[in-house]
Amino acid sequence: MPLTWKDSGLRWYWVAVLVFFADQLSKQWVLANFDLHESLNLLPFFNFTYVRNYGAAFSFLSDAGGWQRWLFTIVAVGFSTLLTVWLRKQSASLLKLNLAYTLVIGGALGNLVDRLMHGFVVDFIDFFWAKSHYPAFNIADSAICIGAVLIIWDAFLSGKSETDSAEGVKK
């Protein structure tokens, strides 16, 4: 018998929804309150600075001419769909993997909406030291990175993956 949404990883989909809305609300706040490249200094090493990212993480392919928007759209839809299918097939008890997948889904969909609505992703979290700035990012990027770390942790660092357990994945 297939897992129901209550018994499957889909039970954790609320995390993706929370990430998505937190990301979108924060970006709407930035768009409503900042001009492009405007900064608000919050700490000696931390600003909110509105920048536009036409590429992927660390502005990868940002000056590629526009085609990358559609590539990243396809990748976001593909990964979100694949991870949702995996959530449906695994037990709700697999906390680490369910959390990881839903963080990635929420982040991917948050950045996807930006790409489709604006043609770029709104970034604003700006850490720096002296004059060296880490590339600006957003809540969606953070969720994707945390989710990826959790997936790697599960796959490589924990010795035995949560999915190795007999009750972990419904085949």
From Swiss-Prot:
Catalytic reaction list: Release of signal peptides from bacterial membrane prolipoproteins. Hydrolyzes -Xaa-Yaa-Zaa-|-(S,diacylglyceryl)Cys-, in which Xaa is hydrophobic (preferably Leu), and Yaa (Ala or Ser) and Zaa (Gly or Ala) have small, neutral side chains
Annotated membrane topology: Multi-pass membrane protein
GO molecular function: aspartic-type endopeptidase activity
The EC number(s) this enzyme carries: 3.4.23.36
One Pfam family per UniProt: Peptidase_A8
GO biological process terms, semicolon-separated: proteolysis
Pathway: Protein modification; lipoprotein biosynthesis (signal peptide cleavage)
Gene Ontology CC annotation, any one: plasma membrane
Active site: D123, D141
Function: This protein specifically catalyzes the removal of signal peptides from prolipoproteins.
Protein name: Lipoprotein signal peptidase
Originating gene: lspA
